[in-house]
């Protein structure tokens, strides 16, 4: 008896399968719901210095004592980055990062014209491992360095 097993579109990350907290569609629906609720959440703001040339800010949105969204914004001479961490209980289930690049450095022209944007969504398992990625809404393979990069992003939450 011969059995042939074919794996299509599966990227091995380690010896254990990576199961995201929610499916991609469920994650996107939860993100959309949470984004619409921010006005109803309590929030606190802290400055984030030393992580970009022009500084940054973090806004933490809470429902009672429960974190729902941590929003980080970093500013630089050639662009800015906007990153949101989405929580289910104490678990981050998704990170969405928007990178914006300016036509010219802000020191040359402070009336910013945007050259390009790129939005990356990272979908995590309950242990913070990246199980899925999309770029501008299109599914992509998980980059080799994604796990370490996401650990650094999470470690930067104040």
Locations of the language-model features?
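Bacterial Sec-dependent signal peptides at the C-terminal "C-region" and cleavage site
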Residues: 4-19
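N-terminal secretory signal peptides
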Residues: 16-77
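Low-complexity, flexible helical/coil segments
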Residues: 29, 96, 104-109, 131-134, ...
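Ser/Thr- (and often Asn-) enriched beta-sheet segments in non-cytosolic proteins
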Residues: 45-47, 58, 101, 120-123
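Short, surface-exposed coil-to-beta transition loops
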Residues: 53-56, 78-83, 114-119
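Mature extracytoplasmic domains of secretory-pathway proteins
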Residues: 60-110
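C-terminal partner/receptor-binding element of secreted or periplasmic proteins
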Residues: 117-118, 123-158
């Amino acid at each position: 008896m011969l059995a042939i097993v074919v794996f299509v579109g599966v990227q091995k990350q380690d010896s254990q399968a990576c199961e995201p907290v929610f499916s991609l569609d469920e994650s996107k629906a939860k993100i959309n719901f949470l984004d619409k609720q921010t006005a109803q959440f309590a929030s606190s703001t802290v400055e984030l210095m030393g992580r970009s040339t022009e500084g940054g800010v973090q806004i933490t949105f809470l429902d009672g004592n429960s974190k729902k969204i941590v929003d980080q914004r970093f500013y630089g001479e050639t662009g800015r980055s906007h990153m949101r961490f989405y929580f289910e209980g104490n678990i981050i289930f998704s990170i969405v990062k928007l990178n914006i690049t300016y036509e010219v450095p802000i020191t040359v022209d402070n009336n910013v014209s945007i050259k390009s944007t790129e939005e990356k969504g990272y979908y995590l398992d309950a242990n913070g491992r990246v199980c899925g990625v999309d770029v501008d809404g299109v599914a992509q393979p998980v980059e080799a360095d994604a796990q370490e990069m996401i650990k650094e992003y999470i470690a930067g939450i104040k």
